[in-house]
């Protein structure tokens, strides 16, 4: 079965408070991770929460990268979803873990849009 994309869901633990709470730094790291993986960036949106935390998304031609941080816990939840086979989501994920200084990471990959033959042939949507 072929998949339309690969989605890596990562949990980053033991990251520094200051980096996870700095919206500009988080944005820079996320953008660089997309570029390091060979993605083409389309849009970038990040938000700083009060008293702490950052959420953001980097929309790429191949799909997206998203992050939500809990600086007080040294934790970041990361999604890297890529379509096609030109961008490896693990390249971006590993870059993020390194740049956020994660002491521990758990991650799993899910295939998205796995096309079951009977549905792949149909172009109509019947719900």
UniProtKB/Swiss-Prot annotation:
Post-translational modification as stated in the protein's UniProt record: Is synthesized initially as an inactive proenzyme. Formation of the active enzyme involves a self-maturation process in which the active site pyruvoyl group is generated from an internal serine residue via an autocatalytic post-translational modification. Two non-identical subunits are generated from the proenzyme in this reaction, and the pyruvate is formed at the N-terminus of the alpha chain, which is derived from the carboxyl end of the proenzyme.
Cofactor, how bound (note): Binds 1 pyruvoyl group covalently per subunit.
Organism expressing this protein natively: Carboxydothermus hydrogenoformans (strain ATCC BAA-161 / DSM 6008 / Z-2901)
Annotated InterPro entries: AdoMetDC_C, AdoMetDC_fam_prok, AdoMetDC_N, S-AdoMet_deCO2ase_core, S-AdoMet_deCOase_pro-enz
Pathway in which this enzyme or protein is active: Amine and polyamine biosynthesis; S-adenosylmethioninamine biosynthesis; S-adenosylmethioninamine from S-adenosyl-L-methionine: step 1/1
GO CC annotations, alphabetized: cytosol
Reaction catalyzed: S-adenosyl-L-methionine + H(+) = S-adenosyl 3-(methylsulfanyl)propylamine + CO2
Protein name (Swiss-Prot/TrEMBL): S-adenosylmethionine decarboxylase proenzyme
């Amino acid at each position: 079965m072929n998949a339309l994309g690969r989605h890596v869901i990562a949990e980053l633990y033991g990251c520094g408070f200051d980096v996870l709470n700095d919206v500009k730094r988080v944005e820079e790291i996320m953008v660089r991770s997309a570029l390091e993986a060979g993605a083409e960036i389309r849009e970038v949106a990040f938000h700083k929460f009060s008293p702490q935390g950052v959420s953001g998304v980097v929309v790429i031609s191949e799909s997206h990268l998203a992050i939500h941080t809990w600086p007080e816990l040294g934790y970041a939840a990361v999604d890297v979803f890529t379509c096609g086979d030109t961008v490896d989501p693990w390249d971006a994920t590993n870059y993020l873990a390194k740049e956020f200084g994660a002491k521990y990471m758990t991650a799993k990959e899910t295939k998205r849009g796995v096309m079951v033959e009977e549905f792949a042939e149909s172009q109509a949507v019947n719900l």
